[in-house]
Amino acid sequence: MSGGTPYIGSKISLISKAEIRYEGILYTIDTENSTVALAKVRSFGTEDRPTDRPIPPRDEVFEYIIFRGSDIKDLTVCEPPKPQCSLPQDPAIVQSSLGSSTSSFQSVGSYGPFGRMPTYSQFSPSSLVGQQFGAVGVAGSSLTSFGTEASSSSALSQSSVVGSAFTQDSRALKTQLSQGRSSPQLDPLRKSPTMEQAVQTASAHLPAPAPVGRRSPVSTRPLPSTSQKPIENQEHRRAEVHKVSRPENEQLRNDSKRQIVPGAPSAPRRGRGGHRGGRGRFGIRRDGPMKFEKDFDFESANAQFNKEEIDREFHNKLKLKEDKLEKQEKPVNGEDKGDSGVDTQNSEGNADEEDPLGPNCYYDKTKSFFDNISCDDNRERRPTWAEERRLNAETFGIPLRPNRGRGGYRGRGGLGFRGGRGRGSGRGGAFTTPRGFRGGFRGGRGGREFADFEYRKDNKVAA
C-alpha cells in the first residue's frame, strides 16, 4: 500500500454477506489479518436486498468499525480522498496542525496511539498485540477529511482519479482482501457476521488510522499532548466509582480507623444505631498469620517458672477461699461446716474432716472418683443468673454475639421468642432462635408473642 494508492481516505461503500450496507471513510487495511477499518461509518441496513433478517438503517455514526475481509460481499469506492494543500517538504518543520482541531498529535515515527484510538491488543489477545493505530496517510501523507490534525513531515501529492480508476481500485482492494487470511482468533468478538468491533462514542476526537506503508522520513518528537487529559479524567472517574461501590461496612471501618488516636489500643466498639450488629472484632490480626522461625522450646520456657512460688501462691489462695466459705456458712446455716459438696460414692467422711493424707493431697482414688481441688459453695440454694453467667463465662469464654447491636431489632414485642436466662443474641426479631446459656422460653411480654401461654420451668404448657 506504499505505492501511493488512493484508497486511504476514500469514501467506501461496503456490503457484507448479511446484505447490510455500510458507508465510511477507508481507515486502514490489514492484509495480514484480512481486516478493513472504516471511520465515520453509517449503517444503511439491508435496503430491500433479499435476506432472511431485514435490518433497518441506523442514524448513528460510528467512530470506526473493523470488518472481516472474508465476510465482505461487495466493496466500491464512492469518492476519492479530498485533495489538500500540503506544506512544502521542509526539514525544518517538525510538526504542524490545523487550527480547527483540539487534540495534539503524537509522533508519526513512533507509531503511537493517536487521540483515544484503542490498539488492536484491546480487541483480541492474539498475534495482534502491540499493533497500534498511528498517523493517517500513505507513506506519511496527511489527510484533513477526518477532521483531525496530521503530520505533514512528508506529503505526497494526490492526483485526481477518474471513474475508471475507481473500478480498478475496487477490484484491487477486493483481491487484496481475498488473498489475506481470515483471523480465527477474532471469531468470538464479532457481534454480526461482518462487524468485529463497533465503537460509538460521544467524543469530538476522531481517532486516526495506522500508516500503511513506510515510516515518515523525519522522526518527529511528540509534544505535550492534551488528549491524555480525557484519559486521566476517565481513570479518575473510574476510581471514584470504585470508591462509591465499596461495601458500606468497609467505609464504616475506615471511618472508625481515622477516629482512633495513633498509638492507642483499639477496643471493641458497640454500635449504637443503624444496622451495626455485633460488638466489634475480637483481636483479628490484619497482617496475616504469625510466622514462626523455629519450634517452641518447652525446656527453656519451663525453666523460667518457679514451681515453689506458684505452689505457695496456690495454697494461699485456697486457704483464703476456705476461710471465706466458713464465715459465710456460719451466719446462714447456724451450724458447723457441713458436706463439702463432693459426692462420694462410698460416703466415707466429709470434706471438712481432716485429710489423713495431708493438705497437699487433692485426689484420693480410694475415697472418691472426684478430686478435692475445686469445691463450690455447698449451701443448698440455686445460684443467681449473674453467678451462673459469670461461671459459664469463666468456663466456656465469652461467646460472640453478632446481633447484640443497640440499634436494630431489639423490641420486646414482635413475633419472636425471647432468649433464655443467658441473654441470647437477639431479644426480639422475627422468629429468632434463643441462644441463651440456659435455654428455656420465657413468657411473652405483650404484642403477638403468645401471651396466652406460660412456659414453665419444666417446659409444660399450662393454659
UniProtKB/Swiss-Prot annotation:
GO cellular component term, pick one: mitotic spindle
Modified residues (N-acetylserine): 2
Record has Cytoplasm as a keyword: yes
Bias-annotated ranges (Basic and acidic residues): 232-258, 322-340
Biological process annotations from GO: mitotic spindle assembly; negative regulation of translation; P-body assembly; stress granule assembly
Compartment list: Cytoplasm, P-body; Cytoplasm, Cytoskeleton, Spindle; Cytoplasm, Stress granule
Ranges of residues in domain Sm: 1-81
Basic residues composition bias: residue spans: 269-283
GO molecular function: mRNA binding
Compositionally biased region (Gly residues): 410-429
InterPro entries xref list: DFDF, FDF_dom, FFD_box, Lsm14-like_N, LSM_dom_sf, Sm, TFG_box
Phosphoserine, modified sites: 178, 182-183, 192, 216, 227
Positions with biased composition (Polar residues): 172-185, 194-203, 217-231
UniProt keyword Phosphoprotein present: yes
Domain DFDF: 284-320
SUPFAM superfamilies cross-referenced by the UniProt entry: Sm-like ribonucleoproteins
Pfam family, one: FDF
Family: Belongs to the LSM14 family.
Function (record text): Essential for formation of P-bodies, cytoplasmic structures that provide storage sites for translationally inactive mRNAs and protect them from degradation. Acts as a repressor of mRNA translation. May play a role in mitotic spindle assembly.
Domain-level remarks: The LSM14 domain and the RGG repeats are required for accumulation in P-bodies, and the region containing the FDF motif is responsible for cytoplasmic retention.
Protein name, UniProt field: Protein LSM14 homolog A
Source organism of the structure: Bos taurus
Classification of source organism: Eukaryota, Metazoa, Chordata, Craniata, Vertebrata
